[in-house]
Amino acid sequence: MGVSYIPIARVGELAPGTMKEIDLGGRQVLLAFVEGKYFAFSRNCPHEEADLKAAGQLLDGTKIRCNNHSYCYDLQSGECTLPKGAAPLTVLPAEERGAEICIRLEW
């Protein structure tokens, strides 16, 4: 199994509690900086494909709420926490590597 790291931003580029949109070869993802950690996830809410850049609200802790229908997701696991059992949010492992924030891909 191999691992690749794709740089998507620089450390310090995002203020706490903010998000940035990233284009990964045509796939739109968001990068959030919450509680000192970076989280990368799908830009679209899995419920009805709402744009989380426009409709998403970062909550205390590592949660995001889609304000279109109040679905809430855990940014660490992607689990839908409200309502329980709904389709999960796609999350990608993001980590600091030196001065860069990278998405880790395993293949």
PLM regions: where:
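Zn-dependent metallo-beta-lactamase
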Residues: 1-23
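Rieske [2Fe-2S] iron-sulfur-binding domain
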Residues: 19-107
